[in-house]
């Protein structure tokens, strides 16, 4: 575990998608709880920025479009981000991309917590450990302490929608997102499970909203068919 100092500058790397960010919330809260005075920055995907801006744990956000390394302009911008005076870089993504960042963009003396070969603080063997617990352990290696996140920031966040009907009828809504990455269909939760949750919530008086991309249409329709009107 790293020594805690008020002037520490911590860079966290965690890209999207949405599910990965949700799994990281406990780790984000734990990192901030253990480093209350530190400057903590989050490097993430552009699509996550609007959500990340609402989070109470970060002082700075860095957009990483994850462009190809041969895109010299984008690569230079990311390299410059890594060349700031970071006390520690916390890799919660642990992907081939972030390992390439470590190999090519990060100063040789940088403190790096992750799985990159040769990094200063390698993570333990996480075989059989779920993503949420992996990231909490990673946060603790950067001085974090166990902390369940206070989600009031999300409840109190300003709603952004073009659907005025949603904004003015003052009903209670629950959003279900049945889709997932097409590259990993095994991650998709069964439609009947979503429908069971939707039916239970509808019975309690909530309005159910199903969202997704065009690729999620089949999953959304399956859930919709099992829900009441």
What does each model-identified segment do?
Residues 1-229:
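Catalytic machinery of carbohydrate-active enzymes
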């Amino acid at each position: 575990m790293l020594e805690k100092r008020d002037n520490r500058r911590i860079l966290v790397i965690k890209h999207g998608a949405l599910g990965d960010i949700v799994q990281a919330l406990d780790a984000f809260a734990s990192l901030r709880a253990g480093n209350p005075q530190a400057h903590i920055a989050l490097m993430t995907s552009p699509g996550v920025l609007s959500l990340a801006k609402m989070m109470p744990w970060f002082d700075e956000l860095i957009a990483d479009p994850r462009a190809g390394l041969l895109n010299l302009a984008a690569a230079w911008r990311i390299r410059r981000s890594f060349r700031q005076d970071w006390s520690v870089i916390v890799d919660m993504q642990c992907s081939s991309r972030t390992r390439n960042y470590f190999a090519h963009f990060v100063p040789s003396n940088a403190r790096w917590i992750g799985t990159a070969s040769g990094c200063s603080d390698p993570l333990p063997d996480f075989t059989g450990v779920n993503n949420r617990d992996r990231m909490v352990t990673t946060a603790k290696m950067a001085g974090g302490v166990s902390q369940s996140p206070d989600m009031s920031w999300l409840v109190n966040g300003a709603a952004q929608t073009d659907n005025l009907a949603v904004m003015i009828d003052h009903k209670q809504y629950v959003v279900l997102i049945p889709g997932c990455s097409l590259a990993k269909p095994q991650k998709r939760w069964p439609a009947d499970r979503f429908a069971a949750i939707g039916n239970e919530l509808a019975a309690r008086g909530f309005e159910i909203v199903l969202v997704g991309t065009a690729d999620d249409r089949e999953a959304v329709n399956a859930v919709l068919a099992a829900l009441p009107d």
